[in-house]
């Protein structure tokens, strides 16, 4: 834990070496088998012995970049007065704006009064408008560059501007209502999922994620990228497959 893997390789004696860095020190652990679970695009760099065609397959999917922002409001009166809990905002910086789901745990109950605090949850999909010549993978790469070039001040300004535009008429005041903003930048966010508009339809077993996840020696490859699906159930499916490969 808290270590960064930098190399995984099959040894001539049938074992596997995994090299990693922890607390500034390089270490190597030796094992009978290994599951390499991580961002598919990084796997070829961590395991250079992969054949070129498999490296190309692993590099096909491009992670979807996001900014997930939480805004804590001292008073949620202006939002509650609007009477809507979720907004789709095409063309705006945040395409989705919603009140965070209320959480009840033990003796804790969420605020319910009109003037009680409220958390807003906002999603920015960092991809520029398509020119017509770009694939979704091209747009995700451009969006990642855009996302990483933004400062917190840029994100803060866009956040306050959109909230003011949406809820100013119901009394929202950015100067007095906002207690805190937390912006989570996911430069490499969701696993790539194929789109009929941009991707071919491959025969079963020949899609890039299927070719890319083939075991090499005693190393198996997992992560949701190997399922071409971004959610936890896919990561679990990948883990089960990889474990079965090494048993």
Predicted feature residues:
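Mid-domain catalytic core of redox enzymes
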Residues: 2-132
């Amino acid at each position: 834990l808290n270590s960064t893997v930098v190399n995984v390789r099959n040894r001539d004696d049938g074992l596997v070496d995994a090299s990693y860095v922890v607390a500034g020190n390089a270490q190597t652990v030796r094992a009978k088998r290994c599951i390499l679970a991580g961002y598919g695009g990084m796997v070829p760099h961590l395991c250079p012995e992969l054949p070129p065609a498999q490296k190309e397959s692993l590099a096909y999917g491009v992670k979807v970049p996001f900014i997930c922002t939480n805004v804590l409001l001292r008073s949620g009166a202006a939002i509650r007065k609007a009477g809507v809990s979720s907004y789709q905002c095409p063309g705006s910086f945040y395409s989705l704006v919603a009140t965070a789901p209320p959480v009840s745990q033990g003796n804790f109950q969420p605020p319910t009064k009109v003037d009680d605090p409220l958390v807003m949850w906002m999603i920015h999909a960092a991809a520029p408008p398509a020119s017509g010549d770009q694939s979704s993978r091209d747009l995700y790469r451009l969006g990642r560059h855009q996302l990483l070039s933004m400062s917190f001040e840029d994100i803060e300004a866009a956040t306050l501007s959109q909230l003011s535009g949406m809820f100013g008429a119901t009394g929202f005041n950015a100067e007095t209502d906002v207690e805190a903003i937390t912006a989570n930048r996911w430069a490499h966010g969701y696993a790539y999922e194929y789109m009929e508009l941009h991707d071919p339809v491959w025969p079963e077993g020949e899609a890039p994620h299927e070719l890319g996840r083939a075991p090499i020696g005693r190393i198996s490859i997992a992560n949701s990228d190997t399922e071409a699906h971004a959610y936890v159930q896919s990561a679990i499916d990948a883990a089960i497959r990889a474990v079965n490969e090494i048993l």
